[in-house]
């Protein structure tokens, strides 16, 4: 469905003078040839630049001409790209929680949206049919049957870890994993964790089996916490009963006239004999005290 063209003064989104123009294909002079991010489409007069793959995988954007497998250049209308930018400004990324997430899971009922690089971080599946020019993305949960998030087999993964050990880099790898876990823990604590954070921890704890013994030990922590809460609850009940008893005692004192509401409590707090002793100090003692100053 076509998106409403926004108003305002933003040079990227306003004006229809260039609505029939197409984006120009540029290649980054510093990126390796064939790199995912090396191809950029640019339209100078509208001040728009976008990675080719970000355009290809954006859910609300299609090329403005028929796909030609023999022609590597793509055809993106500036007007369509502006609409997609505006659409993305209203969509939050399921991975980083920032707006501008135009890449959605291809399953229509799935609410997940991503920036393309965030989708890769979240181990989403990219599907390309170059003959028909279709580019699809699926989140981990809705990946097509039989297709794993990574196509590297287990033997290669194990070999990678052994090579890290031999190269003296295994400690650094685990330190980075630890930093990642600390970062996720921080987002959980300040209530900014994304859905992908919850999904990742769920997979880590329940699907891989690596932390099975951790969950068994965690059961003891749950029991200990429950006992601690129950003990605090009993203490609070005892305190409430004590406070209620004190309140009842005060009411009884008032009814018996022990507490006189009209009595003054502004007098000296010293015992009567001590107060009298201070009042009867001789003038010589008082004078001596004055001389010492």
Swiss-Prot record:
Protein known as: PHD finger protein 11-like
GO molecular function per UniProt: zinc ion binding
Residue segments, region Disordered: 263-293
Keyword Nucleus: yes
Subcellular location: Nucleus
Zn finger (PHD-type) location: 91-143
Keyword terms, alphabetized: Metal-binding, Nucleus, Zinc, Zinc-finger
Chief localisation class: nucleus
Zinc finger (C2HC pre-PHD-type): 25-61
Primary gene name: Phf11l
Upper taxonomic lineage: Eukaryota, Metazoa, Chordata, Craniata, Vertebrata
A UniProt-annotated Pfam family: zf-HC5HC2H
Gene Ontology cellular-component annotations: nucleus
């Amino acid at each position: 469905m076509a998106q409403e063209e926004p108003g305002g003064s933003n040079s990227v989104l306003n004006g229809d003078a260039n609505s029939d123009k197409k984006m120009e294909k540029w290649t980054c002079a510093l990126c390796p040839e064939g790199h995912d991010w090396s191809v950029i489409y640019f339209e100078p007069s509208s001040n728009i630049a976008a990675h080719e793959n970000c355009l290809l995988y954006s859910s609300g954007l299609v090329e403005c001409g028929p796909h030609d497998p023999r022609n590597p250049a793509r055809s993106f209308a500036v007007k369509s790209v502006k609409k997609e930018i505006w659409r993305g400004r209203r969509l939050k990324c399921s991975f980083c929680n920032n707006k501008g997430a135009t890449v959605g899971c291809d399953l229509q009922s799935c609410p997940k949206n991503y920036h393309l690089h965030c989708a890769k971080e979240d181990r989403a599946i990219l599907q390309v049919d170059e003959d028909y020019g279709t580019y699809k993305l699926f989140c981990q949960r809705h990946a097509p049957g039989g297709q794993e998030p990574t196509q590297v087999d287990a033997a290669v993964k194990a070999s990678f870890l052994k090579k890290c050990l031999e190269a003296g880099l295994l400690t650094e790898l685990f330190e980075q994993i630890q930093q990642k876990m600390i970062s996720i823990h921080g987002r959980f604590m300040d209530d900014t964790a994304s859905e992908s954070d919850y999904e990742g921890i769920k997979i880590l704890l329940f699907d891989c089996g690596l932390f099975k013994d951790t969950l068994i030990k965690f059961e003891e922590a749950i029991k200990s916490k429950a006992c601690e809460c129950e003990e605090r609850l009993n203490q609070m009940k005892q305190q409430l009963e004590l406070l209620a008893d004190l309140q009842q005692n005060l009411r009884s004192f008032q009814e018996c006239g022990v507490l006189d509401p009209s009595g003054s409590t502004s007098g000296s707090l010293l015992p009567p004999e001590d107060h009298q002793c201070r009042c009867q100090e001789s003038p010589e003692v008082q004078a001596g005290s004055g001389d010492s100053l």
